Amino acid sequence: VIGMICAGTLAALGAQIGLKGPITSHPSVKDQLDALYEYKDSPVVVSDNFVTSRGPGTTFLFALTLVEKLVGLEKRNEISGPMMLV
């Protein structure tokens, strides 16, 4: 599983990870990714084992998505329930 958040998604571009696939990032770097990716304005974007997220405000959703990818939906639900995320 590869996870990138905020402007860190520029590393995907440099490493040519997931080219032409869906991706998200901090809006400040969107223009740098737009031509080579299917850019989404979603808080978290999952493409196979590549997970990207927008920034500090999306970190809980990003982390829970990584938990789900690594150990399953049941564990994600177990963790997220007590957190009372909206």
Residue ranges and their predicted role:
Residues 1-86:
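Active-site-adjacent pocket-lining segments in enzyme domains
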